[in-house]
């Protein structure tokens, strides 16, 4: 019985720490500042197209304009690679800035 409790406790701690790590990734306030560059082409407060699609509710959508599912990894790849008129930002933004930007996009 003691072994079961220890294993259960360890599993719970491991799961909890994983959730905390993923929740801590990116800072939406910093991401809002990064978004200033994106706002030239994207509306943050509606879905109307500027040069690129409006991004309000972006993470609530099933798919991005390229047909891929809206996930952190796919959004980061889109930021890195660009496409459909969007420039690639792989070498222009740090990984931390991309994480911050993604955190901000989740608030829209």
Feature names for model-found ranges:
Residues 31, 35-44, 101, 105:
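The canonical Cys-X-X-Cys-His
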Residues 25, 69, 92-93:
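Short, conserved sequence motifs enriched in acidic/basic residues, glycine, and aromatics
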Residues 28-33, 43-77:
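Gly/Gly-Pro-rich "capping" loops immediately C-terminal to redox-active cysteine motifs
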Residues 49-60, 77-108:
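Axial heme c-ligation environment in periplasmic c-type cytochrome domains
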Residues 1-28, 78, 104-108:
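Post-cleavage N-terminal segment of exported redox proteins
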Residues 21, 65, 88-91:
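Short, flexible active-site loop motifs that bind/organize anionic cofactors or intermediates
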């Amino acid at each position: 019985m003691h072994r079961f409790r220890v294993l259960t406790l360890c599993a719970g701690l491991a799961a909890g720490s994983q959730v905390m790590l993923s929740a801590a990734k990116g800072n939406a306030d910093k991401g809002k500042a990064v978004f200033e560059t994106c706002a030239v082409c994207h509306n943050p407060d509606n879905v109307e197209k500027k040069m690129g699609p409006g991004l309000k509710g972006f993470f609530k959508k099933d798919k991005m304009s390229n047909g891929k599912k809206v996930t952190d990894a796919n959004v980061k790849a889109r930021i890195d690679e660009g496409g459909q008129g969007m420039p690639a930002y792989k070498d222009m933004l740090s990984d931390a800035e991309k994480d911050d930007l993604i955190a901000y996009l989740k608030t829209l």
